[in-house]
Structure formats: structure tokens, C-alpha cells
């Protein structure tokens, strides 16, 4: 009796495994919200300064109003910060090329924003959809003060 139950259990397990649907992995596509199919261009529309989570000031920096930020969907995760005609610094490059990264676990988008630094910085993605994005970076050691940067998508390929 015991061997019959083992046999039936084995047959059921083989049948369950043999009849299961083939698993086809789908590629990770969440980052396409940043890049589109090939690339997506964003512009900054607003800065907010916060203190203890409350917005204390809203402003726009004139020299960044015509800058463009291009995220590419290639395997290198290429990124370009294209400076417009209004320069923030005398030695500001017309195009700053680098890489972008995104960590879903921490909602961190790492990229260069020349107004802050010539190096890539980690921004927390607060909200993002196909047309708008809001990122935040803290500027003090206690994480009580931050800048929130609002972007609008203006071109997608």
C-alpha cells in the first residue's frame, strides 16, 4: 500500500511538472519611463526647496530653463546634459555626457545635473510617469533639507 501511494505521488508530480506552462521571462521595462523606446529628452520646470519635508520655496533658475537632459535606452545607459544658450557658469560645457543608473530597491536615479555638480549624484525618484518626473536630493547630513526638481518630457524617440 505504501509503495502504491509513493508511485501515485510520483506520477502526480511528474504530470504537474510536465503539464506546466513554459516560463518566458519578460525584460525589465520600468526604466523605459525615463528613456522611451530609444531615448527621451526632459527639461526642468521647477525647483522646490524643502525643510523637514515642507516646501519652503519654489523657484526656477533661469540658466537651466533651456537645458535638456537626454536618457538613452541603450545597454550603456548613456546620458547627456545639453546646456542651452543661457550658461550658469563661464566654463559650462555645451554637452556633458555620462551614464545614468536606476535602483528600483531604493528608487534612486543617478545622473549628472551640472547646476549641482559635474559628477553623477543620487536623486530619489518621488514620482514619475511618461510625461513628468519629480526627483529629490538632500543637501544636509541630517536629511532635513532638500531640493525637489520637477521635469517634463519634451521629446521621445
Model-derived features with residue positions:
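Detector for intrinsically disordered, low-structure N-terminal pre-sequences
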Residues: 10-13, 32
